[in-house]
């Protein structure tokens, strides 16, 4: 009688699949605890910061400890615990942890409510992990919205700054439009295949195309265009980039750092899954389309960055350009290209978060911009004039990040671009690679322009005062140390990064 009542765990498929959701469950518990902690202990700001970082670290450890051989699925295939999900999920979780560590100083300076801030960031990362692991179109879309909605609120969280509210409105309107395009494209694919499972979509579409159905190919091409447009907005590729400069500049600096890395990485993972696993029959079309988008994105991002006087806005256009570089790996339509994209986004995590950490350090050390009274210290390029004389160590750290963003050896940025260029070249996109090399040369002008201000120009009278040592901010110190190590060591010893990437692909 007991045997018929108490079923073994293997007979309970929902419970048996829960371990695949372990990182997501940790993030969910962390977000809920942050909300409750802010309700009962609103003054424990440092605790909220370290709780967020700890939750991200535990979720990251669980992700790294999972066995992804064979591409396991859960909950009937709607959730995939495979290598693609793990590699990109690691970057999103690391971005959450690093952003949390450097947020307390900025939130204190900007007088932002930290309980909502950290919980929204945790919920957004939860959405990223869900969409990265989605094996079903419906789950993918739900994860995307769970990622986007908290970011809309995060962008507007600095209520005293009118730029923040303006950026949030722009981002919400453009994001809603892009989500509608993506949903429309997925609905067309569902109409063609009768399936929401991404892998099954590919099988049904292959059958329809093999029998020369005259209606299938045109409809599939339209769906492909809508999916590229919807996800192109999330990645900030040309011509879907128009929101990025204003939103990146107007959002709180920590939010800009988070969304420029984590949201971009999750969107690239979804783009890779939908194209490689859902639409492989259309690869001749979408690979050429991605190569064309990459060229436009690299050119516009780098050329527009030349004219900027705000470092945050310059980094916004730089993020657009880096999205173009990352597209080269997907355009290659090969396992090597996907590995190169994952490796590059991992490196981009270190060099971009590190650059924003320097901006936040200058902001925290200055009273300028407090309570939304104009731009924060560190946002304008002229704030970096004479930084080497005022804070030699901080200037040296920033110089490493600038070299890595440019792609100058022996930094990790060089190795990341080399892997992408090699994959694209092997796939037959030689001219595209030449354009990418030219664009990297253009980027040296504005990146090294910051270095020129730091080392070859005198400080302004109103330049933010900084000490000669990076002291007083434990979280920022940790972020700068981790990002500096990644930007340097992965350039000198790229085998360590390649070994980790090869484990998943």
Swiss-Prot record:
NCBIfam families in UniProt:
NDH_I_N
Q: Where is the signal peptide, in residue numbers?
A: none
Q: Where in the cell is it found?
A: Cell inner membrane
For membrane topology, the record states: Multi-pass membrane protein
Query: At the top level of its lineage, which domain of life is listed?
Result: Bacteria
Q: Name one GO cellular component term.
A: plasma membrane
Q: How does it assemble?
A: NDH-1 is composed of 14 different subunits. Subunits NuoA, H, J, K, L, M, N constitute the membrane sector of the complex.
Q: Name one Pfam family in it.
A: Proton_antipo_M
Q: What does this protein do?
A: NDH-1 shuttles electrons from NADH, via FMN and iron-sulfur (Fe-S) centers, to quinones in the respiratory chain. The immediate electron acceptor for the enzyme in this species is believed to be ubiquinone. Couples the redox reaction to proton translocation (for every two electrons transferred, four hydrogen ions are translocated across the cytoplasmic membrane), and thus conserves the redox energy in a proton gradient.
Similarity comment: family membership? Belongs to the complex I subunit 2 family.
Task: Spell out the InterPro entries in the cross-references.
Answer: NADH-Q_OxRdtase_suN/2, ND/Mrp_TM
Biological process terms in GO annotation: ATP synthesis coupled electron transport
Entry annotated with the keyword Cytoplasm: no
Keywords, ordered alphabetically: Cell inner membrane, Cell membrane, Membrane, NAD, Quinone, Translocase, Transmembrane, Transmembrane helix, Transport, Ubiquinone
Could you tell me what this protein is called? NADH-quinone oxidoreductase subunit N
According to its UniProt record, where is this protein mainly located?
membrane
Q: Which GO molecular function entries does the Swiss-Prot or TrEMBL record give?
A: NADH dehydrogenase (ubiquinone) activity; NADH:ubiquinone reductase (non-electrogenic) activity; quinone binding
EC number, UniProt record: 7.1.1.-
Query: Membrane spanning segments where?
Result: 20-40, 59-79, 83-103, 115-135, 137-157, 172-192, 220-240, 251-271, 285-305, 314-334, 342-362, 394-414, 431-451, 481-501
Q: Which reaction does it catalyse?
A: a quinone + NADH + 5 H(+)(in) = a quinol + NAD(+) + 4 H(+)(out)
């Amino acid at each position: 009688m007991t045997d018929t009542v108490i079923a073994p765990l293997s007979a309970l498929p929902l419970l048996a699949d829960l371990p695949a959701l372990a990182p997501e469950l940790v993030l969910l518990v962390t977000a809920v605890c942050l909300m409750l902690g802010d309700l009962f202990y609103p003054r424990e700001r440092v605790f909220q910061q370290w709780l967020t970082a700890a939750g991200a670290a535990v979720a990251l450890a669980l992700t790294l400890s999972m066995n992804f051989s064979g591409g396991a699925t859960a909950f009937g295939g709607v959730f995939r615990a495979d290598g693609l999900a793990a590699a990109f999920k690691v970057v999103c979780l690391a971005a959450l942890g690093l952003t949390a560590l450097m947020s307390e100083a900025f939130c204190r300076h900007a007088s932002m409510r930290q309980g909502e801030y950290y919980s929204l960031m945790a919920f957004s990362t939860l959405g990223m992990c869900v969409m990265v692991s989605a094996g079903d179109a419906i789950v993918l879309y739900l994860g995307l919205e769970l990622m986007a909605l908290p970011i809309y609120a995060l962008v507007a969280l600095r209520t005293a700054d009118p730029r923040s509210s303006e950026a949030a409105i722009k981002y919400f309107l453009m994001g809603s439009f892009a989500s509608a395009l993506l949903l429309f494209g997925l609905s067309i694919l569902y109409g063609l295949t009768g399936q929401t499972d991404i892998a099954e979509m590919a099988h049904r579409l292959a059958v329809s195309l093999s029998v020369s159905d005259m209606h299938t190919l045109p409809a599939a091409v339209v769906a492909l265009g809508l999916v590229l447009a919807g996800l192109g907005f999330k990645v900030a590729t040309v011509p879907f980039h128009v929101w990025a400069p204003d939103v990146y500049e107007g959002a709180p600096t920590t939010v800009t750092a988070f969304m420029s890395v984590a949201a971009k990485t999750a969107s690239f993972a979804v783009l890779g899954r939908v194209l490689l696993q859902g639409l492989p029959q259309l690869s001749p079309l979408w690979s050429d389309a991605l190569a064309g988008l990459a060229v436009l994105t690299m050119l516009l991002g780098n050329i527009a960055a030349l004219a900027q006087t705000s470092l945050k806005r310059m980094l916004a256009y730089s993020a657009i350009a880096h999205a173009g570089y990352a597209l080269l790996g997907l355009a290659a339509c090969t396992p090597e290209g996907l590995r190169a994209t994952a490796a590059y986004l991992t490196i981009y995590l270190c060099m971009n978060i590190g650059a924003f950490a320097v901006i936040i350090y200058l902001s925290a050390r200055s009273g300028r911009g407090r309570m939304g009274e104009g731009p924060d210290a560190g946002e304008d390029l002229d704030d970096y004039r004479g930084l080497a004389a005022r804070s030699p160590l901080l200037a040296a750290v920033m110089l490493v990040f600038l070299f890595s963003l440019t792609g100058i050896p022996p930094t990790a940025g060089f190795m990341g671009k080399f892997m992408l260029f090699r994959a694209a070249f092997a796939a037959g996109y030689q001219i595209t690679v030449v354009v990418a090399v030219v664009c990297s040369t253009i980027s040296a002008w504005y990146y090294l322009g910051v270095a020129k201000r730091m080392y070859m120009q005198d400080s302004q009278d109103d330049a933010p005062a900084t000490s000669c040592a990076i002291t007083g901010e434990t979280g920022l110190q940790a972020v700068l140390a981790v990002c500096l190590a990644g930007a340097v060591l992965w350039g000198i010893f790229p085998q360590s990064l390649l070994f980790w990437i090869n484990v998943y692909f």
